[in-house]
Amino acid sequence: MLQAILDFYHSTGFYGLNMGSIIMMLVACVFLYLAIAKEFEPLLLVPISFGILLTNLPFAGMMAEPLLEVHEKLSASGAHLYTAHTAEPGGLLYYLFQGDHLGIFPPLIFLGVGAMTDFGPLISNPKSLLLGAAAQFGIFVTFFGAIASGLFTAQEAASIGIIGGADGPTAIFLSSKLAPHLMGPIAVAAYSYMALVPIIQPPIMTALTSETERKIKMSQLRLVSKREKIIFPIVVTILVSLIVPPAATLVGMLMLGNLFRECGVVGRLEDTAKNALINIITIFLGVTVGATATAEAFLKVETLAILGLGIVAFGIGTGSGVLLAKFMNKLSKEPINPLLGSAGVSAVPMAARVSQVVGQKADPTNFLLMHAMGPNVAGVIGSAVSAGVLLSLFG
């Protein structure tokens, strides 16, 4: 009887608990609290944090790889033949994770984002493209910083640097190509910092701007014709794909989704891309990204370095956008609110909303949201192009 009780205990998760898994489960619970109680981007943090919880449950085997049996036999000619079959299937999340590993989910997310995005503010004010480009500066500064640390190779440093674009799908796509073994920490860092945009950005924005600058009101954007909105995704796809071919996957899917939105003749495809498809992929992507956050993968020096470099990249991207906007404001005949520069990171629409909130704290009658969407959507294109550049250099 005692042996039966011991055998049962050894089969439970309590027997397999260790300090590492307990720490990671506590981290998951903190993320769940932030997502549910504080509403910090719950669409991202709820599936990610639950994935962290699932993967750190002892003996659950959610990310277990399939067990293969290999058999050897001789052919009639005497040659050695090998056959393999699955002796035991892998865990559910292992199979879903192949969408991350093979680079399938990120482009599909971009398809949905394109279907939801109005590029009108960018087309109306092309100068905002510069702010989106400036915000990518953090990617390359952090790339060199990661190499200088001596902890990472060039491929790993490129994958870490892309966190500065504040674009989770792009970070997953690039790291799956250049540093698959670091995809988990990089993806969790990228999505976590995206969710924490309302906390990370405002102190940087207020530190780099005066109250007078934050009160600057922008002139009304011009109306953009339907023809312009249809031509835009086609032209961008052609130009970006010719200049940076590795960026074609992400930019092409982004612009296809946007063409669904703007052409007006494929309403069903637009609706599916921006609702059902992106919601399903967000669930799969979030849970599987979280499931890579095992105690063995996360509780080590390299992971802490990735988290530290990631937030530095994000901060530099935010700051460089604000500083360029201040510089442009000096040269431009029309006033430019420097708060728009921080929206150049590609966390859509969180970064644009932060610009609006910080601006309204200085002047409640100031409405910056639509103006901030210009650099915000430019940042989406910019992060995809940056990923393409890094992939062409180190892929």
From Swiss-Prot:
It comes from the Bacteria. The chain crosses the membrane at residues 17-37, 43-63, 103-123, 128-148, 180-200, 230-250, 278-298, 304-324, 374-394. Pfam families: OAD_beta (PF03977). GO terms for biological process: sodium ion transport. One of its GO terms (cellular component) is plasma membrane. The N-terminus is blocked. Coiled coil: none annotated. InterPro entries: OadB_MmdB. One of its GO terms (molecular function) is lyase activity. Its EC number is 7.2.4.3. Keywords: Cell membrane, Ion transport, Membrane, Sodium, Sodium transport, Translocase, Transmembrane, Transmembrane helix, Transport. It catalyses: (S)-methylmalonyl-CoA + Na(+)(in) + H(+)(out) = propanoyl-CoA + Na(+)(out) + CO2. Tunnel subunit of the sodium ion pump methylmalonyl-CoA decarboxylase, which converts the chemical energy of a decarboxylation reaction into an electrochemical gradient of Na(+) ions across the cytoplasmic membrane, thereby creating a sodium ion motive force that is used for ATP synthesis. The beta subunit catalyzes the decarboxylation of the carboxybiotin carrier protein and the coupled export of Na(+) ions. NCBIfam families: Na_pump_decarbB. Belongs to the GcdB/MmdB/OadB family. This is Methylmalonyl-CoA decarboxylase subunit beta. It comes from Propionigenium modestum. The gene is mmdB.
